[in-house]
Regions:
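Non-heme di-metal
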Residues: 1-128
Length: 128
């Protein structure tokens, strides 16, 4: 049953970048929300954009491109908010304290769905 599968998938937050909203307290911390938007939504924008370029069906490719545009908009909001909020050393320190863990968590979520490429593993080692 397709509807049942959709509902079951929607409940698996550990497989989605949105799980980081809770982990990093993004709903009550504007700095963390900006970080989430910039990194997670930015990653989503790149992924949807890449899929839009690879899909042969023009209808689906167009839909994916629209999703990529929306995700880019959210990432831009995050970047703008961080630029505004990170004017103090305290705010910068708060971001710097979590950013590498955030990247690793986002990478783990992506890898759980698609597998991990050796190149991605090397890139993530830079954040150790």
């Amino acid at each position: 049953d397709m509807q049942e599968a959709v509902v079951a998938h929607a409940k698996k937050l550990e497989l989605k970048g949105a799980a980081l909203i809770k982990k990093y307290n993004c709903n009550s911390n504007p700095l963390m929300l900006g970080l989430y938007q910039l990194l997670a939504e930015g990653r989503a924008a790149r992924n949807w954009g890449m899929m839009a370029k690879c899909i042969k069906d023009p209808f689906i490719a167009n839909r994916y491109a629209k999703i990529a545009k929306d995700e880019t908009f959210h990432a831009t909001i995050g970047r703008m908010e961080l630029e505004k909020l990170c004017e103090t050393q305290e705010a910068q320190d708060e971001i710097n304290a979590v950013i590498n863990d955030f990247r690793r968590d986002l990478h783990a979520i992506n890898s759980a769905k698609t597998g991990e490429l050796p190149e991605a593993r090397e890139l993530m080692a830079a954040y150790a």
